[in-house]
Structures are given as structure tokens and as C-alpha cells.
Amino acid sequence: MSKECDRKMLFNIKSLMLPLDSITEFGDECYAHLSEDGNQKETLTEHTRRCQKYWFNIVEAKHIETVFIKFEQLYMGDITNEARYIFELMSVNVVTLHDIGKINPLFQKLKMKNNWKREYAPESISSRHSIVSAIFYLDYFLDIINTAKGDGRINRNESDVLKDFAYIHSYIISRHHSDVNSLEYFFDGLTGKNKQNDNSGEDAYKWYEMFKQELYEEPVVKLRKYDEWLDRMVYQSNEKNIYLYAWTRLLYSLLVAADYYATSEFMSGYENNDYGNVNNIDNIINEYENNDVQKSILNYEKNIKRLDEEQFAKVNKDTVIGNIKGINVLRTEMFLETENNLKNNIDSKIFYLEAPTGSGKRNR
């Protein structure tokens, strides 16, 4: 067992993040972006480091590592430290490999004006890079999983679950420049069975297979049939599937945000240090509490007895209480109830507050 696995992993993100040059030697030969005037080029290595920096900063600023740990406990359960290590390595390095597909020679030629390894230019996928990155990711981590299973460091069940995540994470990478659609659509594309004839996944796999064989004389890990994965999801509890859905959306959001910040830094020269955290809270509260709507609510709270359920149900457009009329009575009552519940749970993590259309959410 590796030294990293001598203890229980708790998402030590910086130690888990891989340098790009440990995965490919082409990071400094290939470019990720051009400046608007075309005079400056950002290498793939530079872009990856920026993305990793922002990914880490967002996780740290939002305390997302606690979510990682909780998900790992709830979804993965009792697994070996080696399996835990591989899972965490796979999760953290979604950002590391998300643009590695830009070593596609046609992307370099058509997008970066870089005539790099033209003899390996793909015929079927043009300059696309996201789906190529997804294949790179799959091959890299499926190989790690297979090796660990072959060495007896992880068992078959752990191998199956880790492979599930390898496919899910590669799917996230494939969609990082677009919306999240059907995972089944992605699997169909990998196997050449996409009903909309979008078999770019299979085409990217075939190109990558040729590229790796020509350069390194190494085979690409064979892709599995996704029926096994779908069967596992069907028989898995709804609760675990909800965890998995939330995990997928979280990693997708983190990747897109980090990529955006990193690209913006290169294009503008501005290094972002604000991740939506509120630092001037006293000024904001003072400004907010002095607007007319909030003054009206505070006056209502001070001078009017709160409605019980029966009274609340009888409020209509002609109801007048104090200087508040109709639907604004309902909005005021809902605001005060929400505020009281929030104050009573001020030390809790609150992720979602639901309110119907027309309830005055903009004032909250």
C-alpha cells in the first residue's frame, strides 16, 4: 500500500492535485488560449495551473471540503484506504485533465495557430477538445484502477464503484463548455450507438488509441458496457442516487467556475480573489434595513400581532392590516416567519429556502 494510504484520507486537496507534466510532456508545447489580439499565448500547463489555483481557492473559500468528506462517508461507506485515495485523486484531478484534450493537433492548428504534430491530426473529431479530454481522463484513471485491482490493493466491488466515478467524471469533463445533458447520451456516444448520430466519444477514443499507440506503443484501456453501470444505479437506493446527482452537479459547477476565472485572468490580466463571499456585511445590513419595504416590515413586526394559521388562510386582496394591504400581508408574514426560523437555526448550514412565485423573494 502506498504511503499516502497509511491514514484515512480527508481530501488533502493540495497533496492530491497532480502537476500536468506528470501526465503529459506536451503541456508546454501546446497552447490553451490566445489573447484577443493574438499576440500572447497561454500554454496548457499555465492554464491548468490557473484552473487548479481557482478550484482550490473556491473550495477553501466555500468550505466545500466538508461536503466532499460527507459525500465520501455517505456514498462510499466502508472502503479501504487505497480505494479512498484513488477516489479522492480522481475527484480533485477532474480540473487537472479537463483541457488536456487541447493537445489535439487540429485544435492546436485551427484554434491556436500552432502547427504541432500535424501527422497525428484526427479526421473525424476536427478541433474538438472536451470529448478528447474525457477520453484522456478515462484512460488515465481506469488504468490506475485496474492496476490497483490487479495488485490486490482494492477489491472487485471497490473497482466497480471507482470505475463508475471515472465515467461520471469524464462525462463532466466532456460537458464543461455546455450544459449537463443525459449521461446515457454520453455513454451511447462512447459506444457508437448514439441515436442522434453523435458518436464523437467513439471517434475521440479511436483517435486517442492511435495517438497513444504511435507515440508510446501502449494500449488504451478498453471501455466497459454501460449496462452494468445502469443496472447498479437502478438497484441503488434513491437516497444514494440523490447524493450522486448532487456530487455530479457540484464537480461540474466547480470546474466551470475555475475554468472561467482562469481564462478571465489570462485574457484580462486580473487575478480574482472574490468568490462571492460577503465581507462588508454591516454596510449591507444598514442599507437594507433603511429601505421602505424593510421599514414597513419592521413596523408591522413591532405593532401588529402575528397571524395564526386560520387568520393567515383568510387573507385576500382586500385585507388591510396596519398600513399593509392584500398580498403584501402574506409577504410580510412569510418574511417574518422565515427570518425567525433562520435566527433559530443560525449555526446550521442552510442550503435551500423555498418560497412560491410572488412571495417577495427579491426582498429576501
Where are these regions (language model features)?
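Walker A/P-loop
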Residues: 346-363
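Elongated alpha-helical scaffolds
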Residues: 123-135, 164-175
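N-terminal pre-P-loop "Q-motif" helix
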Residues: 44-48, 323-347
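Conserved structural-core and active-site-/substrate-pathway-adjacent residues in large, well-folded domains
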Residues: 51, 59, 94-98, 133, ...
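Intrinsically disordered, low-complexity domain-flanking/linker segments in eukaryotic proteins
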Residues: 65-79, 145-161
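An active-site-proximal "capping" alpha-helix that borders the catalytic cofactor pocket
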Residues: 46-58, 127-143
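N-terminal accessory nucleic-acid engagement/regulatory domains that precede
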Residues: 1-29, 53, 148-319
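Acidic/His-rich, divalent-metal-binding segments that scaffold phosphate/diphosphate chemistry
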Residues: 1-123, 305
